[in-house]
Amino acid sequence: MQISLKKYTLELKHTFSISRESHDFQDTLIAGLTLNGKTGYGEATSNPYYKITAESMIKEIEGIKNEIESFEFTTPESFHSFLEEKELSNFAICALDLAAHDLYGKLLGKPLYEIWGTNNDQYPTTNYTIGIAELDTMVAKMKEKPWPIYKIKLGTDNDVAIIRELRKHTTATFRIDANCAWSAEETIANAPQLKELGVEFLEQPLQADDWAGMEKVMHQCVLPVIADESCIVESDVEKCGLHFNGINIKLTKCGGLTPALRMIKKAKLMGLKVMVGCMTESSVGISAIAQLLPQLDYVDMDGAILLKRDIANGVRIGEDGSVVFPTLGGSGVTLNQ
């Protein structure tokens, strides 16, 4: 099996801001695995919050390149088990795991959702994310991209007022992501007003380790709350089940599709709502997420829509949020360059 690694710098259409950072460009690593004339692609973006760069991931993977290329590939699951034994970050494992799943599906000539025993005739609509900005800029972004569901990034001193103003310009469903910027008291106080303004749920309002605060929120908040920063890996699901109404799985954080599939199963057994979210990433990562759609309650896979230019082809998202799946097997990904 041959491996290729390449860093890309993705340019965004607009500056993207959340409660803790802003950026106009996003570095990402694209990994390729080639076997028997087929190449599978995977992606993992850099992430300053977790101190991950494209360069650090490349260095990690290059350290075991010979072992990867001599690995007897049979299934993505066995390959993931092999990777877990190495000293790799979950981000690096994710890039390789996504490539392995894409390769596996291409070798079989089947899309991943079919291999997993699901079909793609019903799936949740992705939200479109509006980052923190001046109010007129946020309104302009909504008008530029009419969409049935918006995720609104918050974490300012006037969050409820922002939603009240945005509501004047659309009838779309709102989802709120405060990225750990609120206290339990703020969350409980804001929720009734936000519910009246058409907010569906709140995503990670509190700091990731504020379990006592989340216990208060669980008992007193009138809106469902979805874990993001509190739910990183498989072992987090059980604790989140006692403090949240659902979880948002990020493939880069948990280590790819292989653990994500297990997390989905575990969360559903616990009665939790399941969402998969994206980074600002290309269609390589988005197409992998899309394979999970039939198993999800919610999805946030607008990352490639936020880019000035995508580096890959795969799943396409229509102007109404509909998804067009590629005819290729696996995730169906090809690179543009």
Curated annotation (Swiss-Prot):
SUPFAM superfamilies: Enolase C-terminal domain-like, Enolase N-terminal domain-like. Its EC number is 5.1.1.-. This is L-Ala-D/L-amino acid epimerase. Pfam families: MR_MLE_C (PF13378). Broad specificity dipeptide epimerase. Catalyzes the epimerization of L-Ala-L-Ala, L-Ala-L-Glu, L-Ala-L-Ser, L-Ala-L-Thr and L-Ala-L-Met (in vitro). InterPro entries: DgoD-like, Dipeptide_epimerase, Enolase-like_C_sf, Enolase-like_N, Enolase_C-like, Mandelate_racemase_C. Belongs to the mandelate racemase/muconate lactonizing enzyme family. It comes from the Bacteria. Mg(2+) binds at D177, E203, D228. Part of a large, functionally divergent protein family. Protein modeling and substrate docking were used to predict the substrate specificity, prior to biochemical analysis. Its cofactor is Mg(2+). Substrate binds at T129, K151, I152, K153, K250, D300, M301, D302. Binds 1 Mg(2+) ion per subunit. One of its GO terms (biological process) is peptide metabolic process.
